[in-house]
Amino acid sequence: MEYLSDKFSLKSPAIKGSDYYMDQVMDTLDNVQYYNKASPKCVQAFPMQSNDQHSSMDRSSPCDNQSSVTYCAPKSEESSLHAMENCCSLRVSPATSGPDKTDLDELGEKCDSNVSSSKKRRHRTTFTSAQLEELEKVFQKTHYPDVYVREQLAMRTELTEARVQVWFQNRRAKWRKRERYGQIQQAKSHFAATYDISMLPRTDSYSQISNNLWTGPSAGSSVVSSCMIPRGSPPCVTSPYPHSPRAAEHGYVGFPNHQQNQFGVNHVSLNNFFADSLLASSANSHAAFETKPEFERRSSSIAVLRMKAKEHTANISWAM
């Protein structure tokens, strides 16, 4: 009661004992809104303002007349309601109005642009032909220029020292990559050439040479070259057919022939040398010759008959 007496003090003590005093206190308690968690924030923000207005109105208004009391209570209610409307309008207005919404969108876009601009962007430098020429000249001299050289080069090319340093780093990386690639290609070509020669298909040249030697009419020659046989060797060693006239005709060492042509002897001896050197280096060819004795005898007999026929025709033509 002391709080109420201090808050709602009246001018005359006689009015305190009347019934009107208690009615006035109850009305003020009903109009005052206390703090409550369930009440909205806008109502909580303006309770003291309504109380102050109500108390000031009570103090200023005369309490002798009852009409003044009825006038005071609606005034406080209207002020509190007006404060609530102002609060709610402040809270609802940004969402409902169109221009305010566009302003908020613009602010959001600006914030996003500021965030994106804060990120570090990498700019690609485009060099001119003159700048590249200057840089390449220095790179041919040294791959690792010092700070002084980089600064001088930056002044000549109108670039920053950092750009020049980055260019040299990229150029060194490119040079190392090319060197590595060149070494790999060189190794590949070397091994490819080595293995390609070894993997070539081998033709059966020895069998063809042996067949041409034994079956051809003009291919009758010794198996062993005359250049590789000593002069003192017997006729059985120098020629496989010591009793045939072909040995004398081709000019073996054991059977010299004075009537032979010089050019024919040279031609036949060279052919015999190359053919016999190939045959002598192959063991398979010797095995082939040893396993076909009947074929050799037949070919030798045919060759002897042909040579006899040639000699007969030559003698007839000479006699005529």
Swiss-Prot record:
Highest taxon of the lineage: Eukaryota
PROSITE patterns for this protein: HOMEOBOX_1, HOMEOBOX_2, OAR
A GO term for molecular function: RNA polymerase II transcription regulatory region sequence-specific DNA binding
InterPro entries, per the entry: HD, Homeobox_CS, Homeodomain-like_sf, OAR_dom, Paired_Homeobox_TFs
Signal keyword on record: no
GO cellular component, one term: nucleus
Keyword Endoplasmic reticulum: no
Disruption phenotype: Morpholino-mediated knockdown causes severe craniofacial alterations including small, misshapen head, microphthalmia and loss of the jaw. It is associated with a more or less severe loss of the cartilaginous facial skeleton. Pericardial edema is also detected.
GO biological process, one term: positive regulation of transcription by RNA polymerase II
SUPFAM superfamilies (alphabetical): Homeodomain-like
Pfam assignment, any one: Homeodomain
DNA-binding region positions on the chain: 120-179
Region Transactivation domain, annotated ranges: 180-320
Localization (cell): Nucleus
Motif residue range(s): OAR: 300-313
Record keywords: Activator, Developmental protein, DNA-binding, Homeobox, Nucleus, Repressor, Transcription, Transcription regulation
Reported function: Sequence-specific DNA-binding transcription factor that binds palindromic sequences within promoters and may activate or repress the transcription of a subset of genes. Most probably regulates the expression of genes involved in the development of mesenchyme-derived craniofacial structures. Required for proper neural crest cell migration into the frontonasal primordia during development.
Family: Belongs to the paired homeobox family.
Oligomer status and interactors: Binds DNA as a homodimer; required for transcriptional activation.
Domain notes from UniProt: The OAR motif may negatively regulate DNA-binding and therefore transcriptional activity. It is found in the C-terminal transactivation domain that stimulates transcription.
Protein name, entry field: ALX homeobox protein 1
Source organism of the structure: Danio rerio (Zebrafish)
Classification lineage: Eukaryota, Metazoa, Chordata, Craniata, Vertebrata
